[in-house]
């Protein structure tokens, strides 16, 4: 953290985590989500083959199905990371696709996280309106800095600015 030379920043400290025990289950949608978030059997097969191909070359690419009681992986710019944050959610009752997919909707309950779940991961409140297409929302949240982190750092900066002159 950088401050002007005329400000005593020696008392600045990065905030401690406030809730290190938050897990994926805590940010999941309360109700059954649309079938559009569930992967097709063909796509899952493609991910498995792609991962095996990369592993055979010693590379680290791969999809990952996250434990609901564990932590989410990084969501990064451009909305990448969706395949590294797959979850199993067996609440789906209607397996009829609402978009064009190859194959059938998987019956294992493997799905990508929803934009609302990504918003929650980034600290956005539930009343934050998600009024764009999912693709744009994934990109926005992937490019976002976690709201709670920025808020906590800003409070510490304010303390320094109020007391540092």
Predicted feature locations:
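Class I S-adenosyl-L-methionine
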Residues: 1-82, 93
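FAD-binding beta-loop-beta segment adjacent to the flavin cofactor pocket
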Residues: 96-132, 137
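Cytochrome P450 core scaffold surrounding the K-helix E-X-X-R motif
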Residues: 84-88
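Short, solvent-exposed loop/turn segments at secondary-structure junctions
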Residues: 5-7, 78-82, 126, 135-136, ...
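Short linear, low-complexity motifs centered on an aromatic residue
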Residues: 89-97
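Acidic-aromatic/histidine active-site loop/patch
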Residues: 150
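Short, hydrophobic alpha-helical segments
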Residues: 154-165
